[in-house]
Amino acid sequence: MARFTIVLAVLFAAALVSASAHKTVVTTSVAEEGEEENQRGCEWESRQCQMRHCMQWMRSMRGQYEESFLRSAEANQGQFEHFRECCNELRDVKSHCRCEALRCMMRQMQQEYGMEQEMQQMQQMMQYLPRMCGMSYPTECRMRPIFA
């Protein structure tokens, strides 16, 4: 009976250790507007707003709100290529400047298109673009409402 109790205690302890070893911790880093102390150094970089592929990708995504989702394979291939290059452009921006660069791009898109509903949809995509590109910091950028 004592051996049975010991074996049962060992099995219980092993199950407890196994269960705690399989915990998953998900960390999300969000950069808020004005939160980064180093954003002052981003002014030059964000004023440039030279993220040509990101702009092209956003324009191609904009087309999905206007057209049917049934687009040609060639158009989808071009869209993917712009997305991939957009991620590369975003990686080239200093990590603490990425959100400001995305906000700058959103301001340009707003001047170009200005449609409230469409811009809100684009803004949601831009908020999560760092995560979509597989970046560890920031994983998302808070965007101020474009239309209030």
Curated annotation (Swiss-Prot):
Disulfide bonds join C42-C97, C54-C86, C87-C133, C99-C141. Expressed in seeds (at protein level). Transmembrane segments: none annotated. It comes from the Eukaryota. Residues 20-38, 69-76, 147-148 form a propeptide. Keywords: Allergen, Disulfide bond, IgE-binding protein, Seed storage protein, Signal, Storage protein. InterPro entries: Bifun_inhib/LTP/seed_sf, Bifunc_inhib/LTP/seed_store, Napin/2SS/CON. One of its GO terms (biological process) is seed maturation. GO terms for molecular function: IgE binding; nutrient reservoir activity. The keyword Disulfide bond applies. Residues 1-19 form the signal peptide. Residues 24-94 are annotated as: Involved in IgE-binding. The mature protein consists of a small and a large chain linked by disulfide bonds. Seed storage protein. Belongs to the 2S seed storage albumins family. This is 2S seed storage protein 1. The lineage of its organism: Eukaryota, Viridiplantae, Streptophyta, Embryophyta, Tracheophyta.
